[in-house]
């Protein structure tokens, strides 16, 4: 199962020493990717050999202007194999779909072919919003829909009737939409995955097998997913 895991250390208070130690642990475990904040990318690049380096972009709010987001993606693409990019959440909630489309096509295009996972922040979305956003993610050329930053605000999510953590039901719904629309997208579930049992239930719910080009699990505790 570890070959499907994106090991993420993204808390804002983590030190360089802690993040580098995490990179060493990622290599030992043999996870799919190690995901860090952009400030640590050049340092972690020196450590990783087998494991792919992933950087988050505009994390966790998705609130920077498109030009800034694209410039950061272009710069990070010199160092990383993968990018987890937060969708422009405010624009999504404002139903400014043309602007959302323009942003994601521009930002994903700046990645130069790197694997891109667009974080849609499921806890904040209505059904109408999530399906419109999935369509735009597919059009943008991204490779994965990623469910959440793992930093969503519980109060707002509850107002919408949404869980803040990953569930098999949500994973199944994303995968079902992808299949129905014929999209060539993978699914990455992140947030609250703490046990091997949880992880297996989510993988089974997605139904894409155990292919890391189609399925990823984001967690800060990859050790518990060893099987």
Swiss-Prot record:
Coiled-coil annotated residue ranges, if any: none
Protein's organism: Pyrobaculum islandicum (strain DSM 4184 / JCM 9189 / GEO3)
InterPro entries: Aldolase_TIM (IPR013785), DeoC (IPR011343), DeoC/FbaB/LacD_aldolase (IPR002915), DeoC_typeI (IPR028581)
Name of protein: Deoxyribose-phosphate aldolase
Pathway entry: Carbohydrate degradation; 2-deoxy-D-ribose 1-phosphate degradation; D-glyceraldehyde 3-phosphate and acetaldehyde from 2-deoxy-alpha-D-ribose 1-phosphate: step 2/2
Family, per entry: Belongs to the DeoC/FbaB aldolase family. DeoC type 1 subfamily.
Positions of transmembrane segments: none
Keyword DNA damage set for record: no
């Amino acid at each position: 199962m570890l070959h499907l895991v994106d090991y993420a250390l993204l808390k804002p208070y983590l030190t360089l020493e802690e993040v580098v130690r995490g990179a060493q642990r990622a290599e030992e475990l043999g996870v799919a990717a190690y995901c860090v904040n952009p400030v640590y990318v050049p340092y972690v690049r020196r450590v990783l050999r087998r494991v792919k380096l992933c950087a988050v972009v505009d994390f966790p709010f998705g609130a920077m202007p498109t030009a800034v987001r694209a410039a950061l993606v272009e710069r990070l693409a010199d160092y990383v194999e993968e990018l987890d990019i937060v969708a422009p959440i405010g624009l999504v909630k404002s139903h400014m779909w043309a602007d959302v489309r323009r942003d994601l096509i521009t930002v994903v295009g700046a990645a130069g072919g790197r694997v891109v996972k667009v974080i849609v922040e499921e806890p904040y979305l209505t059904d109408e919003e999530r399906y419109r956003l999935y369509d735009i993610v597919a059009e943008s050329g991204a490779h994965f829909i990623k469910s959440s930053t793992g930093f969503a605000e519980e109060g707002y999510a509850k107002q919408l009737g949404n869980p803040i953590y990953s569930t098999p039901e949500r994973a199944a719904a994303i995968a079902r939409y992808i299949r129905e629309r014929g999209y060539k997208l993978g699914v990455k579930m992140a947030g609250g995955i703490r046990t091997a049992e949880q992880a297996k239930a989510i993988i089974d719910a997605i139904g894409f097998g155990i292919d890391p080009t189609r399925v990823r699990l984001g967690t800060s505790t990859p050790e518990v997913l060893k099987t």
